[in-house]
């Protein structure tokens, strides 16, 4: 990382974007693709410590990091609050998972005639200090930092356990839809993990539906489709959800 200080009257966003584009085109090849992020902080107090200026420009970058459609980000006062929130979520996550603070909620799914088909697995964080947290306050952060796979795996286990309970009680016609995020494909051996879970709980794979957004599939079509095809052949039902993402989605849209 490097810092450049320019007079406000000399700052030209288009010129900066053009230079970044040129740099990236010179550096990339068939294997590696360079992506540059620029954080812009407007200095309003010349007596402010240089380190603070640098940190604020970095905060602006952190807001768009991982989003390859973004290049330049401008600091605003909300960045500090957002960054502190993100850091606290990440710092508390592993302990919260270990302590059982995350809970699976089930949202019923019906067909057009009102017949119950099953449910979608949602997640809530029963935080000891902040109360019940909804997915929009932490899932995006976990996805951004790559640790969402730990929560996904936890929910998959809970869903399989619940299906086993239903089967034991004689309710053998219902499924639970679980979310598959982009990070799961990279941090987990997805095929072996999911087939291992249904084997562990002795349930049919057709009762554990895999919900994935088209956006996730399109991020690496070849790899994702190969894995999903293997899972479908094993017996899992694949659901494509385009109206929402992650545990915040409201309903299944269509089945592949």
Predicted regions, residues:
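Active-site core of bacterial EAL-family cyclic-dinucleotide phosphodiesterase domains
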Residues: 85-141, 179, 240
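Short, conserved charged micro-motifs
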Residues: 11-18, 48-49, 189
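A short glycine-enriched loop-to-beta-strand structural element that forms part of the catalytic core
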Residues: 1-8, 26, 30-62, 70-76, ...
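Helix C-cap/alpha-to-beta connector motif
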Residues: 154-180, 196-207, 234
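C-di-GMP signaling machinery
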Residues: 50, 59-103, 142-148, 182-191, ...
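The catalytic core of metal-dependent phosphodiesterases that act on cyclic dinucleotides
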Residues: 195-256
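Alpha-helical scaffold within the catalytic cores of cyclic-nucleotide enzymes
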Residues: 12-32, 55-58, 155-164
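Structural preference for beta-strand elements that scaffold enzyme active sites
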Residues: 103, 118-120, 173-177, 207-211, ...
